[in-house]
Amino acid sequence: MSIKAFKGQRLFKGLSQDFLAQLDAIAVQESKEKGDILIRNGDPAKNFYLLEEGRICIRAERKNHSVSFLHTPGDFFGWSCLLDRPAYSASAESVIPSRVVRIEKKKLDALLKKDPLNGLTFIKNFADIIGGRFLNTHSAHDWFPAIET
């Protein structure tokens, strides 16, 4: 089970069965233990992740504060690679035993280019979700001060 577990998620809305099958073929399921680091801030952005089971804490360290987000099943992270950013801008750690699906950036890029119609749908879905996250983050920031470190 990999991409099939995410079939109903917004990221995959409107994608053809063939495209999903090709995506599934390049996806790798991995089990993570509590405390495992999946991504380190500043590491090369080479993989995109989907959280199938468990909890992943994303922590972005800034000059005078840090921001943390807790991802739950169905969420994705490591999306710096989709924006062609050379490095991740946050770290990701497994908070409890978790199962993720990892997709290598080069393989995902090749698939998106090979099937531009589904590729565009995927990117639009991605942009819609990320845009919503930014709106929610901005709204939360209006109510809660930054965490001082």
Language-model-detected regions and their locations in the chain:
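Cytosolic regulatory regions built on CNB/CRP/Popeye-like sensor folds
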Residues: M1-T149
